[in-house]
Amino acid sequence: MTSRIQMHRTSPPPAYGTSAPPSGFTLGASTTSTLQRWALPLLLVAFGLFYLLPLTSHGLWIPDETRYAQISQEMLLSGDWVAPHFMGIRYFEKPIAGYWLIAIGQAVFGDNLFGVRIASALSTGLSVLLAYLITRRMWNDPRKSFAAALLYMSFGLIAGQAGYSNLDPQFTLWVNLSLVALWFALDGRSTRERLLAWAGLGVACGMGFMTKGFLAWLLPVLIALPYMIWQRRLGELVRYGLVAVLVAIGISLPWVLSIHAHEPDFWRFFFWHEHIRRFAADNAQHTRPWWFYLPLLVASSLPWAALLPGTFMQAWKDKRQAPTGFLLLWFLLPLAFFSLSRGKLPTYIMPCLLPLAVLMGSALIDRINAIQGRSIRINSLLNLLIGVAAMVALLYIQLTRPVYGHNEMLGLSLVFIMLMGWIIANLLPAARPLQYWPAPALGIWLLVALLPAGMPGFIVHNQMPDQFIKEHIEELRQTKTLLSNDLGAASALAWRLQRPEVTLYNTEGELKYGLAYADSAQRKVSMAEVGQWVSEARKQGSVGVVMRVKDVVESEEVALLPPGGKRYEEGNMLVLILPQSQP
């Protein structure tokens, strides 16, 4: 067994496995000091420009964003911060903490797009800060700290999810915090410092557990146990780990007991349906082959994908060094665990990307110090190829089968600007890789900032139904009863009107469990019942209907509704205003 490797920080650098920069390319003390002073402010400016400003530029995507917006808004409306409800119906697929943060965003900034998405953006920003801090702790090199934070902030999957309201950025933050705290605990110089870090680990595990479940406890153990065995520090894990366990229990126990008292079936459903069934059952949701995450890892790391081979080679070479070994365990073991699960979604591997960014940042700066820009140039040329191919495809499609109408030139212009920015951002490092290596980040930031706002109308009206609902909000607000045949459209309607009581027409989806309760059974009507239901509802007042019509069955659903009233159509979306019937 490898003997314990002492972890220590050197000041000033060089770091593990790093030779001094050759003559001809040096970063002097003043340059290093300047970078150390301005690294975080520069990243903060980029965060504001490319993460925060675009949050209000486009509607809510279905199904995730409308769901999380509505569930969190309903907590504010009902005052129930214990049991999650989706349009007034029990919804036990996730615990509560993720909804808390989205609800706080809406409470502070209002029931708007910024309020719904700010929790994801801030969670990602804090993860960027964690990447910076752990790299600084491991190598004490401002260049590596800046590189790791920049790479993480510009990984395609991370940047894309930062402006998307769901629970994965939050959960990723808690996992990242737990493992950064673990490293700080292991590398602490004093007992007080170690205890604080172990307590921080407990806070992260408790919040992660209340965001997405037991995985928040499993992942730190999955990394800590083999690492401590390797380092011959298992006794330390047992002694200090108890602090983290007690803090995690203290954080989560009040809600655990409260939800059990409010909804005794919550833990049965959540444990078996969301953990055991999703991981091992033959009928698991989102079933994918074991290798699903391998190509996805390459796509997720764009615009830095061509740096992956060099990163892995350098990491394997340095695997016996404590920082690199820790990061490799953090990257590989969760990736293997998620690959073994039957149910897979792209965002599940987000907790693997921070250690990848740190390893990549370290390897990148080592190559720059050694005046080795070949991999940077290859990476930029790959990105150039992608950008030029996308530009040619856009022009060809627009000329032959236009996807943008004559009144959508703004959207087309935004996409064109985004692609030109991507191309220019990669031309610079292709020409001078050692000087302009950070430039590809600008390309991906322009993409996540401009592409959603530049979507053609047929995507907006089909995938962001809240925008079509917003156009008819005043008429819908005056209706007495609401009906919808699609959960995404229904939740968008409920969120825009701040009215959870939307009756579901011939659909149940993820609300199947909640609709089985007797007090929610009346919230669904079938095709056979809809005629009578509408007739009764119109006696009480006007009825607002929002439909998504994508196939023959949904066309038949529309045909069963009574004629008359006001009718508005756009893409697959249909809004009907059925007036109150005369007595």
UniProtKB/Swiss-Prot annotation:
Protein's UniProt name: Undecaprenyl phosphate-alpha-4-amino-4-deoxy-L-arabinose arabinosyl transferase 2
GO cellular component, one term: plasma membrane
Subcellular location: Cell inner membrane
Keyword tags: Cell inner membrane, Cell membrane, Glycosyltransferase, Lipid A biosynthesis, Lipid biosynthesis, Lipid metabolism, Lipopolysaccharide biosynthesis, Membrane, Transferase, Transmembrane, Transmembrane helix
EC number per UniProt: 2.4.2.43
Annotated spans, Disordered: 1-20
Chain's role: Catalyzes the transfer of the L-Ara4N moiety of the glycolipid undecaprenyl phosphate-alpha-L-Ara4N to lipid A. The modified arabinose is attached to lipid A and is required for resistance to polymyxin and cationic antimicrobial peptides.
HAMAP family named among the record's database cross-references: ArnT_transfer (MF_01165)
InterPro entries, per database record: ArnT_tfrase, Glyco_trans_39/83, LipidA_mod_glycosyltrf_83
Segments crossing the lipid bilayer: 42-62, 113-135, 145-165, 166-186, 209-229, 241-261, 290-310, 321-341, 345-365, 380-400, 409-429, 440-460
UniProt-listed GO biological process terms: lipid A biosynthetic process; lipopolysaccharide biosynthetic process; protein O-linked glycosylation; response to iron(III) ion
GO molecular function: 4-amino-4-deoxy-L-arabinose transferase activity; mannosyltransferase activity
Keyword ATP-binding appears in the UniProt entry: no
Chief subcellular location: membrane
Topological relation to the membrane, as annotated: Multi-pass membrane protein
Pfam families: PMT
Family: Belongs to the glycosyltransferase 83 family.
Source organism: Pseudomonas fluorescens (strain ATCC BAA-477 / NRRL B-23932 / Pf-5)
Reactions the enzyme catalyzes: 4-amino-4-deoxy-alpha-L-arabinopyranosyl di-trans,octa-cis-undecaprenyl phosphate + lipid IVA = lipid IIA + di-trans,octa-cis-undecaprenyl phosphate
Pathway: Lipopolysaccharide metabolism; 4-amino-4-deoxy-beta-L-arabinose-lipid A biosynthesis
